[in-house]
């Protein structure tokens, strides 16, 4: 049973392959997520907690995640919302409640090179003093 924790930084998850590009992280495997070159198969879960906002070209990464997941596998995403998105100078993109529909079969998404066709299982906004977070669960 393969489970991936993308952009783990110092947040290791036991039982997952913890992935990061930084040698200062607590990663088990080192990948630059900008290159979307991971070759795992039959992945059951992918956790992407506060990493997608750091990715300049997210389309190849989302396509790669979809490709790696087994049928019924899930991707758990958490991204900052509202003012919190631009508080960190390393954030390069923002997300809204509509952002992930392009990876869920939204019309014309293939024009942008999107091959992922996730099913959106849930989406939840959780307010906090930093502006809040958007939690999304996608399934292959």
Task: Annotate the PLM regions.
Residues 1-83:
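Conserved SAM-binding loop
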Residues 56-66, 70, 74-140:
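S-adenosyl-L-methionine-dependent methyltransferase catalytic module, highlighting the catalytic core
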